[in-house]
Amino acid sequence: MVINIQKFISSTCNIPIDMLKGKISVKNHDQYNSYNLSIILSWLLHPTKKYGCKSTIARLHKCNMNRVHRLHNLYSKNSNFKSFVDKALQDYKITYASN
């Protein structure tokens, strides 16, 4: 599922998928936002929040587990960031969800 989210963000935001996987460094603010969006969507759409989920998401994005935790806290506390993520979440569900 994380790979589907990365493909969605890559095609929507027009950035290389290798950047979302952490293989290429982020070059500007828009790419940084897309990278963070990929991480938080991976967490929010994960079917079970069990032990090891954050480490799997962090590994697939080549980031620290603490980043996943900080983004989730930001999502919970910042209404602007929450609306930005919720819009992308809705777009993802429209594109990939099966009815």
Question: What would you call each of these model-derived segments?
Answer:
Residues 1-13, 98-99:
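General nucleic-acid-binding
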Residues 11-38, 63:
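Short, Lys/Arg-enriched anionic-surface-contact patches
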Residues 32-51:
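Short, amphipathic alpha-helical "recognition" segments used to contact nucleic acids or chromatin
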Residues 52-61:
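Short alpha-helical "recognition helix" segments of helix-turn-helix
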Residues 69-77:
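Residue-level detection of the helix-turn-helix DNA-binding "recognition helix"
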Residues 77-99:
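Short Lys/Arg-enriched helix C-cap and helix-to-coil transition segments
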